[in-house]
């Protein structure tokens, strides 16, 4: 056994050494290329690509739904969507929220997972070098675990959780969503080929990248991938005909043939079985004969990705030529029907396809260019495609006319107001309140500028300033490639992410409504503005402390003081309780136990009470000036630490009187 273990260690050491030598060789080759292209050493490594990669992956952690593990690194994220699937009798918790909303749309989620897995398939060594391989696998596994849950039968898959219309009508953190979250499925009676085949691709690609570290899990993924692909192939139908709720958000514009090609390719790569390659090639024949070259890979259309993989696998000219037409259109342009056609370029050099997520499309095209450049033997094409991908990536990181990063939490003047409900952290169902985000959504790539390089960091702009799992997928791969090219000597940030400083989450604002020698009336509002993470509570209370020295001096006791309410939104009031008998300090407890106070709406996040402490009529023994909780109060509402707040009996805000 010892001999075997020693051999295994030596074998792994040799493999690691070989990988390092190969990475060094690639770097030297690519540095030669970049110098030929006129790119200086300073420009080549003008960013810490390992840091960008580290942050880009953290974005997926921020998108997690379900019960979060102990390893959760974001103190502003908590468990959410724990009842997902309950309406249909299945556990559909987990997965990723799609974008700045909280719907779990199956098609873009599966696409994002598949592309992320593809980035590991291509650039595993770069992730290893950055010491981020375990992390990217963990992020992908969060999605593939969910797909396994959602695949409840060979021909049954839950393609969506959450109603897009209801979800988009509310603005607040995922942890306190108020709406019902229905689940929608596809099956043999109402199929959805796009989602089934795309998920099969994600699971098949996942099986490849997990095989080295967890063979049993990889085998499980592959089993489900085969079943889902068989389901997609046998029972064909447009998924939005069955999951109609997805139509306004993720309609299948390109149809399902591209997903059948894509899924077949990944199953072939995972199994090496010609059957799947033949199925993919057969599906190619069903694709429109006039292959488009003016678009790029997206959640809706994976043909542009598939043709690159098929070019590598089959070496057929039709796939090679189609791939190069597409990449030429995005780079230098190509002559079609006697005229040069080329993607629109902004004055600052962004390859600009569409306003809605302009950077997402440029990142996707860049990833395809990187992958193809790695394979093509023609040095001029290799240089051209790789140069394009590098420039597009650098544009996103800050090499643009605005000199700003489009990655949240990275670089110069990065976005501060992405269209993202949970990161914003509103407690009042308003995207304008608070005026600034409470949380940093590290690593998120925003939609991006218009065709004139103009961009406004506006939370309300979901076209240019939203984020999404598909936006970051290929972008993450591009950064991994940049690590491979230029990341030598770079390292990830230590102790990242930093723990956010927690603001006052629970507190009381109060004002004096009346005060004389017989009574004091106070208006108090108890707030739940929790955000680390946001959470509803039914066990909140606060205490109002008084000093009864003058009452006892006149021969009265705490039992002579009444505590009553003129206006009350659900609290119970206690008679005065002793706090420090020697100092004659007592308190009234205003207890909202059983009343839900939640940071999910203007009225829902706060509760008001107007209470009075009264001495016997005509006694004239009352003097509030020495009362602890009265200190600093005026006729205007203000936050006060002298009215402490408790949750389930534990102090969560304010200070107690000295004893």
From Swiss-Prot:
GO terms for biological process: cellulose catabolic process. Residues 501-658 form the CBM3 domain. Residues 413-433 are annotated as: Disordered. Optimum pH is 5-8. Pfam families: CBM_3 (PF00942), Glyco_hydro_9 (PF00759). Signal peptide: none annotated. One of its GO terms (cellular component) is extracellular region. It catalyses: Endohydrolysis of (1->4)-beta-D-glucosidic linkages in cellulose, lichenin and cereal beta-D-glucans. Keywords: Carbohydrate metabolism, Cellulose degradation, Glycosidase, Hydrolase, Polysaccharide degradation, Secreted. Optimum temperature is 60 degrees Celsius. Retains more than 90% activity after 24 hours at 50 degrees Celsius. The lineage of its organism: Bacteria, Bacillati, Bacillota, Bacilli, Bacillales. SMART domains: CBM_3 (SM01067). It is an enzyme of class 3 (hydrolase). It comes from the Bacteria. The keyword Coiled coil does not apply. One of its GO terms (molecular function) is cellulase activity. Strongly inhibited by ZnCl(2) and by EDTA. Gene3D superfamilies: 1.50.10.10, Endoglucanase-like. InterPro entries: 6-hairpin_glycosidase_sf, 6hp_glycosidase-like_sf, CBM2/CBM3_carb-bd_dom_sf, CBM3, CBM3_sf, Glyco_hydro_9, Glyco_hydro_9_Asp/Glu_AS, Glyco_hydro_9_His_AS. It is found in: Secreted. The gene is eglA. Active on carboxymethyl cellulose and carboxymethyl cellulose-RBB but not avicel, xanthan gum, carboxymethyl-curdulan-RBB or carboxymethyl-xylan-RBB. Belongs to the glycosyl hydrolase 9 (cellulase E) family. The active site is at 101 (nucleophile), 419, 457, 466. The keyword Secreted applies. This is Endoglucanase A.
């Amino acid at each position: 056994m010892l001999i075997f273990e020693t051999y295994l260690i030596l074998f792994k050491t040799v493999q690691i050494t070989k990988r390092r030598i190969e990475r060094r060789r690639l770097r030297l080759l690519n540095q030669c290329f970049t110098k030929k292209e006129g790119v200086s050493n300073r420009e080549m490594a003008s960013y810490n690509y390992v840091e960008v990669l580290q942050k880009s992956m953290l974005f997926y952690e921020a998108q997690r739904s379900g019960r979060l593990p102990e390893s959760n690194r974001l103190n502003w994220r908590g468990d959410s969507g724990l009842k997902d699937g309950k309406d249909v009798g299945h556990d559909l918790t987990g997965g990723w929220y799609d974008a700045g909303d909280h719907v779990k749309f199956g098609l873009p989620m599966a696409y994002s997972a598949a592309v992320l897995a593809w980035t590991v398939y291509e650039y595993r060594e770069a992730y290893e070098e950055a010491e981020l391989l375990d992390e990217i696998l963990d992020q992908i596994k969060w999605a593939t675990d969910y797909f396994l849950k959602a695949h409840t039968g060979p021909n049954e898959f839950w393609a969506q959780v959450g109603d897009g219309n209801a979800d988009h009508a509310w603005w607040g953190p995922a942890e306190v969503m108020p709406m019902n979250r229905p689940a929608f499925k596809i099956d043999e009676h109402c199929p959805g080929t796009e989602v089934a085949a795309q998920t099969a691709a994600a699971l098949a690609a996942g099986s490849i990248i997990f095989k080295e570290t967890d063979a049993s899990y990889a085998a499980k993924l592959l089993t489900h991938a085969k079943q889902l692909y068989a389901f997609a192939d046998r029972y064909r139908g447009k998924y939005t005909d069955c999951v109609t709720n997805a139509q306004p958000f993720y309609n299948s514009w390109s149809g399902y043939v591209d997903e059948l090609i894509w899924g077949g390719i990944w199953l072939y790569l995972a199994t090496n079985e010609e059957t799947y390659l033949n199925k993919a090639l057969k599906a190619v024949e069903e694709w429109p004969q006039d292959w488009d070259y003016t678009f790029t890979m997206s959640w809706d259309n994976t043909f542009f990705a598939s043709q690159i993989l098929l070019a590598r696998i089959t070496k057929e000219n039709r796939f090679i030529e189609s791939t190069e037409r597409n990449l030429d259109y995005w780079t230098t342009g190509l002559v079609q029907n006697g005229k040069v056609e080329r993607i629109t370029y902004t004055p600052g050099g962004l390859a600009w396809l569409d306003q809605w997520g302009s950077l997402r499309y440029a990142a996707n095209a860049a990833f395809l260019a990187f992958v193809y450049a790695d394979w093509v033997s023609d040095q001029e094409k290799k240089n051209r495609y790789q140069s394009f991908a590098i420039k597009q990536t650098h544009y996103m990181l800050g090499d643009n006319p605005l000199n700003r990063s489009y990655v949240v939490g990275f670089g110069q003047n990065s976005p501060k107001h992405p269209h993202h409900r949970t990161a914003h952290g509103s407690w009042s169902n308003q995207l304008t309140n608070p005026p600034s985000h409470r949380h940093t959504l590290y690593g998120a790539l925003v939609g991006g500028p218009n065709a004139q390089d103009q961009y406004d960091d506006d939370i309300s702009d979901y076209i240019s300033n939203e984020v999404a799992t598909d936006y970051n997928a290929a972008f993450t791969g591009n950064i991994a490639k940049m690590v491979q090219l230029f990341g030598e000597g770079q390292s990830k940030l230590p102790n990242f992410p930093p723990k956010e400083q927690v603001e006052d989450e629970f507190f009381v604002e109060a004002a004096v409504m009346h005060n004389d020698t017989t009574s004091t009336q106070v208006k108090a509002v108890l707030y739940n503005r929790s955000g680390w993470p946001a959470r509803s509570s039914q066990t909140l209370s606060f205490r109002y402390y008084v000093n009864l020295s003058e009452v006892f001096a006149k021969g009265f006791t705490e039992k002579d003081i009444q505590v009553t309410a003129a206006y009350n939104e659900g609290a119970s009031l206690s008679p005065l309780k002793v706090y420090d008998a020697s100092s004659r300090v007592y308190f009234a407890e205003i207890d909202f136990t059983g009343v839900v106070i939640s940071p999910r709406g203007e009225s829902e996040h706060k509760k008001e009470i107007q209470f009075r402490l009264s001495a016997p009529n005509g006694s004239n023994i009352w003097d509030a000036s020495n009362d602890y909780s009265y200190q600093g109060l005026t006729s205007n509402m203000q936050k006060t630490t002298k009215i402490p707040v408790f949750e389930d009996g534990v102090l969560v805000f304010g200070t107690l009187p000295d004893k």
